[in-house]
Swiss-Prot record:
Protein name (Swiss-Prot/TrEMBL): Acetylglutamate kinase
Top-level lineage group: Bacteria
Chief location bin: cytoplasm
Organism the protein comes from: Parasynechococcus marenigrum (strain WH8102)
Protein EC: 2.7.2.8
Keyword Cell inner membrane carried by entry: no
GO biological process, one term: L-arginine biosynthetic process
Residues binding substrate: G70, G71, R92, N186
Site residues by UniProt (Transition state stabilizer): K35, K249
Reactions that this protein is recorded to catalyse: N-acetyl-L-glutamate + ATP = N-acetyl-L-glutamyl 5-phosphate + ADP
Family indicated by similarity: Belongs to the acetylglutamate kinase family. ArgB subfamily.
A GO cellular-component term linked to this record: cytoplasm
Pathway, per record: Amino-acid biosynthesis; L-arginine biosynthesis; N(2)-acetyl-L-ornithine from L-glutamate: step 2/4
Compartments it resides in: Cytoplasm
């Protein structure tokens, strides 16, 4: 007679797999754009957890698209090369020397580290920058006083379609060129992820951050708002509940939803396997913003 299944950890694993099943069925064949950065990129154990999450998503038929930043490593290289780092209005002021470092780090180092990490797990990852195939066309941000800081002028999703159809996972750095002069610009990775999600008609946009999500009280991590309608997210910005660095992330979610993305999530990337917990469990771990409902 077979022994009964162990209680405790074994039963919990079975329960988690069972809970994930309807979500796996629902999102198989769907596209999810993930912005990867912050603490989830800086610590080896969290990096490995993110890579495994992405590999599992791909294994069960989800089509993940990864957009990444790399601020901490950029700062390390600027310091090593004795180039001063300057931030204004929450954006990195980017002169020509700084842009050279940004492009080297994001396109040449961080992007390949992510691609190699995914490929080692059997995932077929392909590294791109926004400039490749004019995937993302840039325009100068604001009045140009921040130097080579850019915004998204246009997205050409046709570059990604053949890759996604063949089961590849695109890994995209947030560097793109202006079409007129071909100059590389540094674009906020959240912005690139949001615009790509809209252009790809993605099911979800997920921003991995260094906070639990949108908080009712920014000083109280237990005040996490689990779910918001689009109109409620706008109201929180107007009321000043969403402020500081959370404002552009929330605005990014709002823009993506307004362009047809089904749901946008702000998730704590410091939590191991945050992606799977958000996508494949009933409760999730972050804030989900939806267009309606």
């Amino acid at each position: 007679m077979p022994e009964p299944i162990q209680s405790g950890d074994d039963a919990l694993r079975v329960s988690v797999l069972s809970e994930a099943l309807p979500y796996i069925q629902r999102f198989s064949g769907r596209r999810i754009v993930i912005k990867y950065g912050g603490a989830a990129m800086a610590h080896a154990e969290l990096r490995e957890a993110v890579f495994r999450d992405l590999a599992l998503l791909a294994c069960v038929g989800v089509q993940p698209v990864v957009v990444h930043g790399g601020g901490p490593e950029i700062n390390q290289w600027l310091k090593r090369l004795e180039i001063p780092a300057e931030f204004r209005d929450g954006l990195r002021v980017t002169d020509a020397d700084t842009m050279d470092v940004v492009e080297m780090v994001l396109v040449g180092r961080v992007n390949k580290q992510i691609v190699n990490g995914l490929n080692q797990l059997g995932t077929r990852a392909v590294g791109l920058s926004g400039s490749d195939g004019s995937l993302v066309e840039a325009r100068p941000w604001g009045d140009g006083s921040h130097g080579l800081v850019g915004d998204v002028a246009r997205v050409n999703p046709d570059v990604l379609e053949p890759l996604l159809e063949r089961g590849y996972v695109p890994v995209i750095s947030s560097v793109a060129a202006t079409p007129g002069d071909g100059r590389a610009h540094n674009i906020n990775a959240d912005t690139v992820a949001g615009e790509l999600a809209a252009a790809l008609e993605a099911e979800k946009l997920i921003l991995l951050t260094d906070t639990p999500g949108i908080l009712r009280d920014r000083d109280n991590p237990n005040s996490l708002i689990r779910k918001l309608r689009l109109s409620e997210a706008r109201q929180l910005i107007d009321d000043g509940v969403v402020a500081g660095g959370m404002t552009p992330k929330t605005e990014c979610c709002i823009r993506a939803l307004a362009q047809g993305v089904s749901a946008a999530h702000i998730v704590d990337g410091r939590v191991p396997h945050a992606l799977l917990l958000e996508v494949f469990t009933d409760a999730g771990i972050g804030t989900m913003v939806v267009g309606r409902g």
